[in-house]
Amino acid sequence: MRRFVPPIEAGTKRQTIRAPRAGRSRHVNVGGEMQLYTAMRTKHCRLIKRVHCAGVSPIKIGVAAGWVEIVGSHDGRAFIIRRQDSLDSFARRDGFADWDDMRQFWRETHPDVDVFSGVLITWVIP
């Protein structure tokens, strides 16, 4: 989405949340190069940035209730984010102004989902 291009270019968006892929296919391996594009599958498609994957972790987001659960990729332990300042910080790392902005986006794009289960992919800029 175009709204995420400026924070990716500025280096403030360093993560993305994706639905899990079917079967054994992965989005990316830790340490692997990622190419971040905008307008995929259109004539306006362009590369935004090349980055390296820093982590891939299962994630659940309680959109209505206001929580995020991330399972650590290195130790398998889950931690839950509930405090407003921590939710705001998480949302900013994903390219949003704050948790309310992120929640509104999720409600508009996934109106029937109260709890989203997917994958959190983080990256570093080489």
Question: Predicted segment positions?
Answer:
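Catalytic phosphate/metal-binding cores of nucleic-acid and nucleotide-processing enzymes, i.e., regions
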Residues: 1-126
